């Protein structure tokens, strides 16, 4: 006797009628007929669809157990796979034995009933929302997306590097970082100047949750040539919107001996590979999102895969935006950072294709980006996708120590805090480039979901860390 996931049964793994199998899962619905037969719809999360189980009244525990099953009860069923005569699926289980592992104590108050719930409500019961079709589908797509990224990187010769989550420096040069401390908040030590004495803290200095694994990744790229980081990052940005999370996952490839053009080509190749993997490996889930969330997502992904990326300079992008007939909420001028409305116009309307925008003004970009020969711009790029805007941001890194020191000084950053990062430029420095890809932002693009909190298992945002 073997245990089969529902996905395998529905794919058509047929066994002889007298060969019993075991199916484990949770009850979605129960329907009873006057003929003394009950029909259970059960799911186990292995696929979108539920499996129908036919239970005859002659089972010993039919009256004591089966007729009391409600949504959410967990069961183990032994039976035979048979061809279904009903509409909707090809196979079902003829039960020979059913064991109830867990009852729903109060079906009247069980939050995840068979009816459809709003996504807002489901966020309030985040520990139970994986039991719904929509969050189950999100989770399977997210898994396949992560696997496709790892697979692509492996094929391309990249090594995965696990970078630290606790750091003592600021990669982006911004102030929105979570502090990590073991100091007694009710009895803080102070210096003679009245400042918190972090020498008494666990690490002997200020420590934070990382905003990026990039700087650490550069260290390994300058030894292994091609690496990537893949893990959680944190931003203490007090922004309570559908586009922001305090904790999110980033993929950050870093390539030695590569310039901006090289990394733009890599970004295009990676995106097309993983989108194609999703369309092939998660057919049912993607069709579900197309039916329930956004009917255009399959066409959008297919067009993305078949498109030739447009590539323009930032200055050219500003010219296009200033001369178009579109009215924007934010005035367009050289030196500004592009807003979502500008990115969407370029990708959706002007080019009607993915766009790579390069060479941004240095004053709006991070200190580690390589200064161009004009002294005003840096070798940075953003990949803009139709329907969403920016999905990748990257750059060629500044490999010249003197230039890097000047950039740190211009940003008011203490160069001693970055001593080891600067040290990389003193021993066999090489041109190198990389980019960052937010996993949750990519999930929104793939699934059509509207709120970023619905594509991560337990979202963290201002005043929300309950689960």
UniProtKB/Swiss-Prot annotation:
This chain's protein is named Asparagine--tRNA ligase
- List UniProt keywords, sorted A-Z: Aminoacyl-tRNA synthetase, ATP-binding, Cytoplasm, Ligase, Nucleotide-binding, Protein biosynthesis
A GO term, aspect molecular function:
ATP binding
- CDD domains from the xrefs? AsxRS_core (cd00776), EcAsnRS_like_N (cd04318)
What's an example Gene Ontology biological process for this entry? asparaginyl-tRNA aminoacylation
| Pfam families referenced in this protein's UniProt entry, alphabetically | tRNA-synt_2 (PF00152), tRNA_anti-codon (PF01336)
The protein's location, in the record's own words, is: Cytoplasm
Q: Which PROSITE patterns match?
A: AA_TRNA_LIGASE_II
Provide a GO CC annotation, any one: cytoplasm
Q: Which domain of life is it from?
A: Bacteria
């Amino acid at each position: 006797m073997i245990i089969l996931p529902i996905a395998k049964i529905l794919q058509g793994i047929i066994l002889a009628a007298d060969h019993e199998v075991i199916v484990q899962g949770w009850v979605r619905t129960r329907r009873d007929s006057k003929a003394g037969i009950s029909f259970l719809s059960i799911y186990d999360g292995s696929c979108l669809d539920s499996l129908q189980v036919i239970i005859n009244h002659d089972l010993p525990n039919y009256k004591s157990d089966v007729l009391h099953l409600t949504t959410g009860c967990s069961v183990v069923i032994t039976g035979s796979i048979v061809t279904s005569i009903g509409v909707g699926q090809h196979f079902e289980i003829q039960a020979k034995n059913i064991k109830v592992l867990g009852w729903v104590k109060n079906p009247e108050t069980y939050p995840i009933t068979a009816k459809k719930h709003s996504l807002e409500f489901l966020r309030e019961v985040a520990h139970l929302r994986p039991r719904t079709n929509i969050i189950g589908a999100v989770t399977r797509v997210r898994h396949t997306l992560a696997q496709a990224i790892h697979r692509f990187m492996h094929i391309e010769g990249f090594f995965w590097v696990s970078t630290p989550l606790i750091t003592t420096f600021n990669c982006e040069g911004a102030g929105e970082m979570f502090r990590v401390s073991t100091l007694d908040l009710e009895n803080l030590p102070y210096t003679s100047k009245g400042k918190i004495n972090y020498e008494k803290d666990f690490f002997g200095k200020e420590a934070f949750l990382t905003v990026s694994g990039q700087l650490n990744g550069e260290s390994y790229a300058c030894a292994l040539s091609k690496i990537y980081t893949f893990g959680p990052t944190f931003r203490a940005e007090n922004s309570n919107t559908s586009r922001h999370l305090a904790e999110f996952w980033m993929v950050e490839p870093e390539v030695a001996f590569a310039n901006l053009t090289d990394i733009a080509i890599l970004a295009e190749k990676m995106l097309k590979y993983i989108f194609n993997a999703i369309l092939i490996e998660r057919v049912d889930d993607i069709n579900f999102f197309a039916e329930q969330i956004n009917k255009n997502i399959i066409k959008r992904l297919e067009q993305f895969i078949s498109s030739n990326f447009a590539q323009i300079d930032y200055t050219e992008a500003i010219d296009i935006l200033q001369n178009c007939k579109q009215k924007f909420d934010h005035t367009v001028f050289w030196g500004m950072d592009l807003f979502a409305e500008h990115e969407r116009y370029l990708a959706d309307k002007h080019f009607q294709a993915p766009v790579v925008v390069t060479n941004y003004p240095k004053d709006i970009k991070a200190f580690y980006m390589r200064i161009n020969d004009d002294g005003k711009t840096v070798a940075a790029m953003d990949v803009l996708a139709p329907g969403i805007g920016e999905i990748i941001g990257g750059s060629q890194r500044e490999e010249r120590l003197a230039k890097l020191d000047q950039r740190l000084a211009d940003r008011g950053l203490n160069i001693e805090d970055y001593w080891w990062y600067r040290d990389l430029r003193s021993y066999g420095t090489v041109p190198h480039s990389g980019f960052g890809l937010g996993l949750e932002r990519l999930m929104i693009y793939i699934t059509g979901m509207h709120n970023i909190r619905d594509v991560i298992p337990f979202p963290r945002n201002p005043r929300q860390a309950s689960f």
